[in-house]
């Protein structure tokens, strides 16, 4: 009974080492890219900004930040049951996302070292930050008697290939939405310390600045490649990646609304705020942004959430697998239709939006 409280419902590779969460469309992805194409990029158009960002990376503002203090040195067995399960899942998803960034940035730093030294050093220093984050999160998991085998994760995950342009879109949004997620949680718990169930949240203010600087780096890279931002295809891809990132976060978080409730947040309100701020931030580099203030945007996402719950119910039923397939088809079609309608919603011209904001 004690073990079930400490490790509620988690499979283990070996004692204390958790089996990684099953890969789905909603789990953090591991990426690879065309390293030669990236090495050939001419960054001279925006090299001054990239060099300034490199100096910030070298300064390493957070080199003494990720140090566990006395508040961690206690038993956390009072966090049990569903709260414990949800919190471990939160730590695992966060650790996996940070570690995937580490692997990508480390490989880019290695591959670009001789051909594009400025980018190579930036990627190496960002991989340093991501490794710190992943290690800190994995150590936090050990407070709950579990951890991830990051070496096993490296070898067992499928890697998604993206051309450099798409890597930049995806990682820029990942870093910027990470900033808004962390700082929003930090500010909420700063105002409501009674909801801070675990000390890791105290670290989020400085932590999120790493995410912000990384996002600024990808902003600067894209601005060094104007062809990535200035044609009609850039507008279509901007819409695609914005919608993909927002929909993935929304479906993940609403499914785990009980976790956010444990720290005093309403998951839907939290996501609406984070999406709004990330969308505004993306307008500084993307040619278009989404109309996330339209009621239709969340009405359609909420239908996707309902469909996701239906799919989970079908998958966990005793219905034979071949019948489950046919039961899922109309639900999947409905989700696909909602996402298509969201993609086709009229976007907002980012230049006009920035002008209105000023």
UniProtKB/Swiss-Prot annotation:
InterPro entries: AcsF, Ferritin-like_SF, Rr_diiron-bd_dom. It comes from the Bacteria. Pathway: Porphyrin-containing compound metabolism; chlorophyll biosynthesis (light-independent). Keywords: Chlorophyll biosynthesis, Iron, Metal-binding, NADP, Oxidoreductase, Photosynthesis. Its EC number is 1.14.13.81. One of its GO terms (biological process) is photosynthesis. Its cofactor is Fe cation. It catalyses: Mg-protoporphyrin IX 13-monomethyl ester + 3 NADPH + 3 O2 + 2 H(+) = 3,8-divinyl protochlorophyllide a + 3 NADP(+) + 5 H2O. CDD domains: ACSF. The keyword Iron applies. GO terms for molecular function: iron ion binding; magnesium-protoporphyrin IX monomethyl ester (oxidative) cyclase activity. PANTHER family: MAGNESIUM-PROTOPORPHYRIN IX MONOMETHYL ESTER [OXIDATIVE] CYCLASE, CHLOROPLASTIC. NCBIfam families: AcsF, PRK13654.1. Belongs to the AcsF family. Catalyzes the formation of the isocyclic ring in chlorophyll biosynthesis. Mediates the cyclase reaction, which results in the formation of divinylprotochlorophyllide (Pchlide) characteristic of all chlorophylls from magnesium-protoporphyrin IX 13-monomethyl ester (MgPMME). This is Magnesium-protoporphyrin IX monomethyl ester [oxidative] cyclase 3. The lineage of its organism: Bacteria, Bacillati, Cyanobacteriota, Cyanophyceae, Nostocales.
